[in-house]
From Swiss-Prot:
The keyword Transferase does not apply. The gene is atpD. ATP binds at residues 162-169. This is ATP synthase subunit beta. F-type ATPases have 2 components, CF(1) - the catalytic core - and CF(0) - the membrane proton channel. CF(1) has five subunits: alpha(3), beta(3), gamma(1), delta(1), epsilon(1). CF(0) has three main subunits: a(1), b(2) and c(9-12). The alpha and beta chains form an alternating ring which encloses part of the gamma chain. CF(1) is attached to CF(0) by a central stalk formed by the gamma and epsilon chains, while a peripheral stalk is formed by the delta and b chains. Belongs to the ATPase alpha/beta chains family. It is an enzyme of class 7 (translocase). It catalyses: ATP + H2O + 4 H(+)(in) = ADP + phosphate + 5 H(+)(out). Produces ATP from ADP in the presence of a proton gradient across the membrane. The catalytic sites are hosted primarily by the beta subunits. GO terms for cellular component: plasma membrane; proton-transporting ATP synthase complex. It comes from Mycoplasma capricolum subsp. capricolum (strain California kid / ATCC 27343 / NCTC 10154). NCBIfam families: atpD. It is a peripheral membrane protein. InterPro entries: AAA+_ATPase, ATP-synt_VA_C, ATP_synth_F1_bsu, ATPase_a/bsu_AS, ATPase_alpha/beta_chains, ATPase_F1/V1/A1_a/bsu_N, ATPase_F1/V1/A1_a/bsu_N_sf, ATPase_F1/V1/A1_a/bsu_nucl-bd.
Length: 476
């Protein structure tokens, strides 16, 4: 990580300290008695011609501050001069950041020119209570399983829970694509501790999809020091807050992956010598999560709707990291490996997932009733599966056989072709309106398509699409 040259030039006359100890990403710096930096101040050091930024985490006495490096510390040595910028790390803000890609320090990493724009500190207080507003406006995503079973609200927080390789990132990509095209919305994507290759692919996919000019990307990937991974979510959030507060916009903030934010905090906590808490996590886990999540909210100026991918270690939802995240969310989308193994994508488990706004007063009575009937049908099918496994379908009553057939059709119909997956699947992506989704599931539940085999429901957009495919094959 390298800070911008302007920052260095501007601060040439600032207070200078000396490095007295380097322990991996932890650097201790000694200042004079009257010039000790504040917690979270950014310090700058020249590391063999490269500018390295250190963030003050602790004041350990004797005029010494303990810092975490935002970049590699190879080549640092004792006695080097360190400049105090008298300011926290800052992020660039404004319309100019759209279509650009930055690191944790707000420096461009897309090989395009530097930006001379306003910058804001990444450490800020959450909006005060009087500024908050509670909205219950539904955000249409065009993804059937989400719009029907787990509706989003503008200004809400949504968690995507799932283990490795079940489709969290591609679901986020589809949401960005759909929101940009359907709602003309601005998105900020914070890549926290994920694969660099995925970030590169995402950038080029955004260019191909034509949504890059509505998106700002901020990356602190898994090859970077824990300090960068811990702070990059705050950089992305600061950019989103500016669009909300100063431009009065509804913004989408995507964080992939919020678990890596916790993981980086755990690494930093251990490096700073704090006593670990449950399962080895940092004792400040809830505080760190709260300080991030409380800033993601709706105000009278605009809203930030957040979608956060949550890696679940060993698929254990009781792990402290995902469990702490749960408490802040309005909706939870749980991705299930067993559904993915059936070839059904998005692999959303409609029984484990939930949304606070699936309420008849918000989504309407018909929508609520259909969603509830879908849940009941799938739940009943799950209960019957053990009987089917032992005795077979023939031992079921006629009523139960009908439930099983409809449940399998519902399960298949919850699949959907994604725009961002077109080149992998060969199937064109579809955006399905909420009204079409509700109407289609109503037809299945009412028995209007009991005569159509379940295979026709897989990757069909609406019930009209199912009937069209069935009639076409029947005519052959």
């Amino acid at each position: 990580m390298v800070s911008s040259k302007k920052t260095i030039d501007k601060n040439k006359t600032q207070v200078i300290g000396k490095i007295i100890q380097v322990l991996g990403p932890v650097v201790d710096v000694k200042f004079s008695e009257n010039n000790i930096p504040k917690i979270y101040d950014a310090l700058v050091v020249d590391n063999n011609g490269k500018k390295l930024v250190l963030e003050v985490e602790q004041n350990i006495g004797d005029e010494i501050v303990r810092t975490i490096a935002m970049g590699p510390t190879e080549g640092l040595r004792r006695g080097l001069d360190v400049i105090n910028t008298n300011s926290p790390i800052t992020a660039p803000v404004g319309n100019e950041v759209l279509g650009r890609m930055f690191n944790v320090l707000g420096d461009p990493i897309d090989e395009k020119p530097d930006l001379d724009v306003k910058r804001l500190p990444i450490h800020r207080d959450a909006p005060i209570y009087e500024e908050l507003v509670t909205t219950t406006e539904i955000l249409e995503t065009g993804i059937k399983v989400i719009d029907l079973m787990i509706p989003f609200t503008k200004g809400g927080k949504v968690g995507l829970f799932g283990g490795a390789g079940v489709g969290k990132t591609i679901l986020i990509q589809e949401l960005i694509n759909n929101i940009a095209k359907a709602h003309n919305g601005v998105s900020v994507f914070a890549g926290v501790g994920e694969r660099t290759r995925e970030g590169n692919d995402l950038y080029h996919e955004f260019i191909e999809a034509g949504v890059l000019n509505k998106t700002c990307l901020v990356f602190g990937q898994m090859n970077e020091p824990p300090g960068a991974r811990m702070r990059v979510a705050l950089t992305g959030l600061t950019i989103a807050e500016y669009f909300r507060d100063k431009k009065n916009m509804d913004v989408l903030l995507f964080i992939d992956n919020i678990f890596r934010f916790t993981q980086a905090g755990s690494e930093v906590s251990a490096l700073l010598g704090r006593m670990p808490s449950a399962v080895g996590y940092q004792p400040t886990l809830s505080t760190e999560m709260g300080s991030l999540q409380e800033r993601i909210t709706s105000t009278k100026n605009g809203s930030i709707t957040s979608v956060q991918a949550v890696y679940v270690p060993a698929d254990d939802l009781t792990d402290p990291a995902p469990a702490t995240t749960f408490t802040h969310l309005d909706a939870r989308i749980v991705l299930d490996r067993s559904i993915a193994s059936l070839g059904i994508y998005p692999a959303v488990d409609p029984l484990a997932s939930s949304s606070r706004v699936l309420d008849p007063e918000i989504v309407g009575q018909e929508h609520y009733d259909i969603a509830l009937k879908v849940q009941i049908t799938l739940q009943k099918y799950q209960e019957l599966q053990s009987i089917i496994a032992i005795l077979g379908m023939d031992e079921l009553s006629e009523e139960d056989k009908l439930i099983v057939q409809r449940a399998r059709k519902i399960r298949n119909f919850l699949s959907q072709s994604f725009f961002v997956g077109e080149k992998f699947t060969g199937r064109p992506g579809v955006f399905v309106k909420v009204s079409d989704t509700v109407r289609s599931f109503k037809s299945i539940l009412n028995g209007e398509v009991d005569h159509v085999p379940e295979t026709y429901f897989l990757y069909s957009s609406t019930i009209d699409n199912v009937i069209e495919k069935y009639n076409k094959d029947k005519d052959k």
